[in-house]
Amino acid sequence: MQKEEAIKIYKSFASMKDVALLIILVFIATYILISALNNNSEDGIFIYVAMWLTALPAGIAYIAHDILKSVNKLDEIVNEDLDDKKYLEIIYCIIDYGKNHKQKNLQRTFYLIMQERYAMALIINGKRKEAEEYINSGEIKHEPYRMFSRACIDLDRAYAQGDAEKYIKIYKAAPKSYKEVKLHACRALLMQGKYDEAIEGLMKYTPKNKREEILRRFTIGEAHLRKGSKDEAKIYLEYVINNGKTLREKFMAEELYKEL
């Protein structure tokens, strides 16, 4: 994906023509249905209300699907292509454009999601300080996204410092949305020294994409190394080194590999 395509995706959310058309069609269908009734006004009102109660969730689902589809397309850069640097570049491009142009309609919602993605892109590129400055600047207006990003930064710092006690304390206070991610839960087990539990959980977990597979294998390798099983650790770390492309886990795996 190029910057131009990313901007095009952002611009597409300025128009709500498709959503408006959907609502108009439902309205017309409702009107025709009511007119076809045998002049029973009570039934007509009931069906009218029922149709709109159906149409509104359908319209919302349509909008949510459209946004999610675009977000997933952008996330593929890091999740499938394993190119964290390009991911940061593309997300920043959208953030910069959105910040300097008036936001219309669904662009506001899409931009809020991109703000959280930008903070995450900085973190996975090893730019924790910049991510923290971005959050502290108050740019991320949506509180759940801000809290999620803050937890990621604090946990990343505690992990880098090797401070298990601090890591667990932060993890326990992290948003539910963070702790629900299996990879995060297993990382917490590893930091508590529960290596076998972490490995077992990760062995049973089916990754959703290539990046998750890299993260899964890296954590398994690290857990084996920490418990002293160097032969097992070697297998998983070698996979990460050979397939991690530009992901920082590749370079972290290379450092751990030196301990074998």
Please tell me what each predicted stretch does.
Residues N72-E76, F110-R117, S149-D156, E180-A188, ...:
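"A position-specific structural signal for the A-helix of alpha-solenoid helical repeats
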Residues E132-G162:
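A membrane-cytosol interface segment of integral membrane proteins
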